Structure formats: structure tokens, C-alpha cells
């Protein structure tokens, strides 16, 4: 499948899905990718790649001169990300690694320009600490979080480690759903997008 547009936000239904594997939804994904400020040729790390929606879109943004690493502890997620990367024709500049963060991050022999941390890991502080070690100076980290505890732990860890220009945005998306009498707006869970830079 070809995505002909230069902006992120591929519709969710374009991706192969699995109910057991989480997905960063299209509106949240578009905002998170904009907060990453990806450039052509960047090295990107997607921690907790899930369905691969962020991995695929980041790959489209970095182009053939960049590379995106997708990491997930679930074999099903790695396989699903691979299938979605194949579907969008970007498998050539994606590296998939099965393993649990933060431990697996120290086995990757790369430094990254941008790191995306998806989901709500209980090890968010340790993952942020590991990210500091493998991100280049001037690099950006973006975290999606659902739980307030994750937000609190992430902000605290980023401040203590030395990330600068911290920003937190709460996003509430409502999608229209047809009913018998009209269209109702169905609200999704609020998502927090946290970003910071290593200077």
C-alpha cells in the first residue's frame, strides 16, 4: 500500500491489526510524530512498537537515508510490525528487535536522533534513563502515556536526568459515530504526550 501524502496520520484501518496488540491511533500518532520533529536521514527508535503504526510512519518520514528501529517484548507485535512495514513498502529501512526495554536497549549498537516511547511501561523511569544513554545530543524523546502515574514518573525522570524543554500535552479525541437519529461524538481515552530534548 502506498501512502502518497507528506503528512503523518495514516488511517488506522489501513494497518493490519490484532486486538491483543496496542496501536497508537492516527490522531495521536500524527501529534506524536510532529513532536518528534523527524528529518530525512534520522535514526529513530520506537520502543514498544506494537502494531508498527509509528514505526511505519517514521520510516516514511526519514526516507531511504534514515533508519527506524522497532523494539517490542512480544513476538506477535514484532511480526505484526513486520507485516505492516511490508504492506507500506518500508521494511528495507526498518530493524525489528524482540526484547524488553530497558535491558534490550543496551544491546543496540546505535545512537538515535529521535526516540518514541509508546504505551505505559512500569519501567518508564528506567527506559527514559536508558534513552538518555543512546540518544544523540540535540535528540528528542516523545512519550505517549495514558496513566497519570506514568506521566508523573516520566516528567520526574526526564527532569532528574537532564532533558530540557519539557512539554506535556493532554489530547482528548472524539470520533463521530452514526446512530439511528444522527451522529454522536464518542470520546476516546485522554492521552498525554510528553516531549523533551537532550542538549
Curated annotation (Swiss-Prot):
InterPro entries: CbiT, Cbl_synth_MTase_CbiT, Cobalamin_biosynth_MTase, Methyltranfer_dom, SAM-dependent_MTases_sf. Its EC number is 2.1.1.196. It comes from the Archaea. S-adenosyl-L-methionine binds at residues 24, 48-52, 72, 101. The keyword Lipid metabolism does not apply. GO terms for biological process: anaerobic cobalamin biosynthetic process; methylation. Pathway: Cofactor biosynthesis; adenosylcobalamin biosynthesis; cob(II)yrinate a,c-diamide from sirohydrochlorin (anaerobic route): step 8/10. The keyword S-adenosyl-L-methionine applies. Keywords: Cobalamin biosynthesis, Methyltransferase, S-adenosyl-L-methionine, Transferase. GO terms for molecular function: cobalt-precorrin-6B C5-methyltransferase activity; protein methyltransferase activity. It catalyses: Co-precorrin-6B + S-adenosyl-L-methionine = Co-precorrin-7 + S-adenosyl-L-homocysteine + CO2. NCBIfam families: CbiT (TIGR02469), PRK00377.1 (NF001556). Belongs to the methyltransferase superfamily. Archaeal-type CbiT family. This is Probable cobalt-precorrin-6B C(15)-methyltransferase (decarboxylating). The lineage of its organism: Archaea, Thermoproteota, Thermoprotei, Sulfolobales, Sulfolobaceae.
Amino acid at each position: 500500500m502506498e501512502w502518497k501524502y507528506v503528512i503523518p496520520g495514516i488511517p488506522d484501518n489501513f494497518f493490519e491489526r490484532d486486538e491483543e496488540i496496542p496501536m497508537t491511533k492516527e490522531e495521536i500518532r500524527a501529534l506524536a510524530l510532529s513532536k518528534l520533529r523527524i528529518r530525512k536521514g534520522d535514526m529513530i527508535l520506537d520502543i514498544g512498537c506494537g502494531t508498527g503504526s509509528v514505526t511505519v510512519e517514521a520510516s516514511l518520514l526519514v526516507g531511504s537515508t534514515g533508519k527506524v528501529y522497532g523494539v517490542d517484548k512480544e513476538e506477535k507485535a514484532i511480526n505484526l510490525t513486520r507485516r505492516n512495514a511490508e504492506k507500506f513498502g518500508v521494511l528495507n529501512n526498518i530493524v525489528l528487535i524482540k526484547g524488553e526495554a530497558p535491558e534490550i536497549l543496551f544491546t543496540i549498537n546505535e545512537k538515535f536522533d529521535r526516540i518514541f516511547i509508546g504505551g505505559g511501561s512500569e519501567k518508564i523511569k528506567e527506559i527514559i534513563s536508558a534513552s538518555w544513554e543512546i540518544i544523540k545530543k540535540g535528540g528528542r524523546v516523545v512519550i505517549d502515556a495514558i496513566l497519570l502515574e506514568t506521566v508523573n514518573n516520566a516528567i520526574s525522570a526526564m527532569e532528574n536526568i537532564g532533558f530540557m524543554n519539557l512539554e506535556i500535552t493532554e489530547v482528548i479525541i472524539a470520533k463521530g459515530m452514526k446512530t439511528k437519529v444522527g451522529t454522536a461524538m464518542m470520546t476516546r481515552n485522554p492521552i498525554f504526550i510528553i516531549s523533551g530534548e537532550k542538549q
